[in-house]
Amino acid sequence: MMESGVPPCAACGDDAHAACRACSYALCKACLDEDAAEGRTTCARCGGEYGAPDPAHGQGAVVEEEVEESHEPVASGVRERVTMASQLSDHQDEGVHARTMSTHARTISSVSGVGSELNDESGKPIWKNRVESWKEKKKEKKASAKKAAAKAQAPPVEEQIMDEKDLTDAYEPLSRIIPISKNKLTPYRAVIIMRLVVLGLFFHYRITNPVYSAFGLWMTSVICEIWFGFSWILDQFPKWCPINRETYVDRLIARYGDGEDSGLAPVDFFVSTVDPLKEPPLITANTVLSILAVDYPVEKISCYVSDDGSAMLTFESLAETAEFARRWVPFCKKYSIEPRAPEFYFSQKIDYLKDKIHPSFVKERRAMKRDYEEYKVRINALVAKAQKTPEEGWIMQDGTPWPGNNPRDHPGMIQVFLGETGARDFDGNELPRLVYVSREKRPGYQHHKKAGAMNALVRVSAVLTNAPYILNLDCDHYVNNSKAVREAMCFMMDPSVGRDVCYVQFPQRFDGIDRSDRYANRNVVFFDVNMKGLDGLQGPVYVGTGCCFYRQALYGYGPPSLPALPKSSVCSWCCCCCPKKKAEKSEKEMHRDSRREDLESAIFNLREIDNYDEYERSMLISQMSFEKSFGLSSVFIESTLMENGGVPESANPSTLIKEAIHVISCGYEEKTEWGKEIGWIYGSVTEDILTGFKMHCRGWRSIYCMPIRPAFKGSAPINLSDRLHQVLRWALGSVEIFLSRHCPLWYGYGGGRLKWLQRLSYINTIVYPFTSLPLIAYCCLPAICLLTGKFIIPTLSNAATIWFLGLFISIIVTSVLELRWSGIGIEDWWRNEQFWVIGGVSAHLFAVFQGILKMIAGLDTNFTVTAKATDDTEFGELYVFKWTTVLIPPTSILVLNLVGVVAGFSDALNSGYESWGPLFGKVFFAMWVIMHLYPFLKGLMGRQNRTPTIVVLWSVLLASVFSLLWVKIDPFIGSSETTTTNSCANFDC
C-alpha cells in the first residue's frame, strides 16, 4: 500500500514511485520498465529525462528506497531499465504474468515544484495523451499475458477436447438398451394375439367335428395338436419383449482408466477339460493363449485350467503353452491382432496387412508363424507319445511317478505357471497368472462331473486370487474378441445396471460348420431370437460357456437391492386370485429357521462351558454357520466376505497353495451347501440351466451381450451321430430337471422373484423333450392315412376352410415378422425347423425314456465327451458316420412315409379319378414329414451316398412289419361297415 499523500501510478493505478526527479511524476516499476523497453526516456509531464536531477532541489530530493532486500536508487540508468524490461518480457513469453512480481512500498518525498506542462496541437497536455496510451497498452499487455499463461498451462486444443470428452464420458452410462422398433414389434404382437384366437377356434372345430370312421386317428391327431399348441405358447410368449443392447467401452476406460493404475475389476477365467485324446490339447492351448492375450490389465487376469482327467498330457502341453505365451502375448498386443488364438489367426483367409502400417509387422508375423509351427510340432509329439500308456504309468521329468496315473484315485494337484512371480514375456512385461488344477478323486465319493470341477475352481480361485468376477469357457471356445471382458464389465461395473446382475451371457458362435449348416449347429433362432426375448424379461438363460459371473451370486447370496418379500406366497401365477388362508414359508425362510435351530442348539452347548466370553461365543457361532455352508476353510470363508475380491496382503503364497489343495479335496463338500445352494448346482447333466434358474429365483437378473465382433467362438460336432448325441445330452438334462425338486412347474414360488414369463421360458426348457412323443405319432399319421385310406379330418366346410387357412397364414406371418425384427435369414429359420423334427423323433425320445428309467430304476447314464474335429479336409467330419440306435426311429419314419406315398398313388390309380382329391391332402402331409427329415436322409447317405446296411435293414424291417400289421388289423374300420360286409357275405346274390 502507498503511504498517505503519495499518488498511485498514473498509468495503471498500482503502487508507484517517482519516475521523474524533476516533477515527481508517479509511475510503477512495471510501467517504467515498459517505457524503457519502448525507447521512451522522457517524462510525460515535464518533458525532462527520467533520472535527471531537479535544478532547484539538487540530488537530495529523492530518498533511497528499499526494494525487496537490497537498497538501490529510485531511478537507475536506461541500460538497467531495458535489461529488466527484457527479462520481464521473457517471463511474459513463458506465460508468467509480469504483474505477479511483488514490490515493497516505496516512500516518496514531497516535491516543492513541478515543471511546466507541454501541450500538443489540440491543446491537450502531452502527458495525458501518453498516460492514456499507456493504459490502453497496459490492458492489452495484461490480456495477452493472461492468454499466454492459459495457453502454456492448457494442453493443445485437440487434447483439451478429448479430455473434456473423456470427462463427460466418465459420467455417462456404460451401456444402453436399444428397443426394437414399434413398426416391427407392434404387428408382431398383433399377429401373435390373432394366432392365439385362431388357434382356439381351430381347436374348437377339431374337437366338435370328430371323424367317426377313423376315430383313433382323429383322437391321436387332436391330442398331438393340442400339445403342439401348448408348446407354441411356452415358446412364443417369452419373446414378447425382445431388446438389443449397446456397450460403450470407451466410457468404461474414461471412468476406470487403463494400464497399471486401472480401476477395472479383476477377472478369473475358468477353462475345463477332461480327456485330452478327445479334446485335443492344441485346441485347449489355443483357448488358453487367447485368454492370456486379452485386452485387459495383465495383473487383473488369471486363467485356471481344470483337468478332470488328471492327464500328464494336459499338464505338459500347458507347460509348453506357458513358454510359447511369452512370445505370443506381446506380439498380439503390439499389433492388436484379432483373433488372438494362433491356430485361427494364421488360418484366416484375409488380407492380414490391412490396417497394419508398422514396417516390421510382416517380418515379425513370419517369425511368429514359424515359432507357432514349431510349437505345434512339440504339442503333437506329446499327443503321439500319450497314445500308448506305459504299464508302470507315466513318469515326470524328475523321475517321480505322475500323481494322476489313476484318474479315479489321485490327490489334488495345483501348478502355477505364470503370474507376478513367474516368467515374464520377451519384452520384460508381466504375464497373466496361469494355474493348472486337478481336483482330488477317491473311490466312494461323488464327483458331479463338470459341475463339481467348476465348484472346485471357484474355491481354488477364491483362495489364490479371489477376483470378484468369473468368466467360464469350454476348452474348445477361444476368445475371438480381445475386448470381450471389457464388454462384460460395461454391465457389471455400471452402478446403474450392475447391482442386480448375476451374469452376462454371450451368444455362442462356431467355426468349421458347413455352409448350409445342415444340422442347425449355429442354433441361430435360439441365440438371436429367444435369448433377445428373454433379455427383455429377467435375462437370458445360462448356456454353459461364454458367461461372466458375479462371484457373490455363485455363493448363494441375493441381489443387494432385493425388495421385501410379499406377505403371502402363491402356488402358481395362474391361481393368484385364490390366496391361501395362511402364507407358506419360502424356502429361504425355512432354511433360515433350520439354521437358527442349529445355532440355538450350539449356543446351548456353549453356555455349559464356564467363563466363556459372549463375544467369543458369537464369533464361534458365526464361524460354525459359515462352515456349514462353505466348508472347513477359514481362508475361503474370509474370501467370501470380500465383495470386491482380493487376497490379504499379508497372505503367504506357500500357505495359500496348501489351502487351495485343501479346498479341492474330495470330501470338502460333504455336509455343506455346495451344489445345493452354492456354486454350480448338482442334479442334472445340464448344470448350466439349473444354476441360472436358481439365480433368477433369488431375484437376480442376467444380461445378454452381443458385440459386433463375436466375443467367443467354438467348435461344434458337425456329423450326424455326434450332433444327435449332443442333443440327447441336453434333452436328458432337461428331463432330469423336470423330474427333480427344482422343476420350474413347482419350484421357486415362495419369494415371488421369478417373473411369470421367465418361468414360462424355463418350463419350456425342461418340457420340450416330451414333445417327441406326440411328434413321432404325428409324423406317422400321414403314412397310416395313405395305407388305410382314412384321414384325420372330415370333409371341410366353408367355415372349416377359413379356420385352416387362418391358422396357416398366422403361422407364416408370425415367422416372417419374427425374422424381420431379429434379422436372421430364412435359411437359418428353415434349418431350425428341420432339426426340431429330426431331434424330436430321435434324441429327445431316447432322453425321455432314459430319464424316466434313471428316476425309477436308478440307472445312471454316462456320457462320453464329444470328440472334436480332427479331419484335415474341409468339413471332413460332416460325412463321418457312427452307428447309434438313435438313428433308427427317424429312419423308420422316413421309410414308412415313402412306402405310404407309393401305396397312396397305387390305390388312387386303381380306384379312379374320384379318389385323387383326398389323396393330395394325404400326400402333402407325408411330404411335409419327408421334407423335414431330408437333412437326416443326406446324413445317412454320407459322402458316398450310401446308407449303412444295418440301418437300412432295421428300418425296412420295422416299417414293413408295422405296415403289414396295420393292413391286417385295420383297426379304424367302423362297426357298421363290418356288419354290412358280413350280411352281404351271407346273402347269396
From Swiss-Prot:
Chain residues that bind UDP-alpha-D-glucose = 272, 278-279, 308, 449
Which Pfam families does the protein's record reference? Cellulose_synt (PF03552)
Which InterPro entries does this one have? Cellulose_synth (IPR005150), Nucleotide-diphossugar_trans (IPR029044)
- Cofactors, names only: Mn(2+); Zn(2+)
The free-text cofactor remark is: Binds 2 Zn(2+) ions per subunit.
| Keyword annotations | Cell membrane, Cell wall biogenesis/degradation, Cellulose biosynthesis, Coiled coil, Glycoprotein, Glycosyltransferase, Manganese, Membrane, Metal-binding, Transferase, Transmembrane, Transmembrane helix, Zinc, Zinc-finger
- Which parts of the sequence bind Zn(2+) 2? 20, 23, 43, 46
- Residue spans, topological domain Cytoplasmic: 1-184, 235-772, 820-835, 906-916, 968-989
Q: What is its main location?
A: membrane
Q: In which pathway does it act?
A: Glycan metabolism; plant cellulose biosynthesis
- Function statement: Catalytic subunit of cellulose synthase terminal complexes ('rosettes'), required for beta-1,4-glucan microfibril crystallization, a major mechanism of the cell wall formation. Involved in the secondary cell wall formation.
Entry's family note: Belongs to the glycosyltransferase 2 family. Plant cellulose synthase subfamily.
Q: What is this protein called?
A: Cellulose synthase A catalytic subunit 4 [UDP-forming]
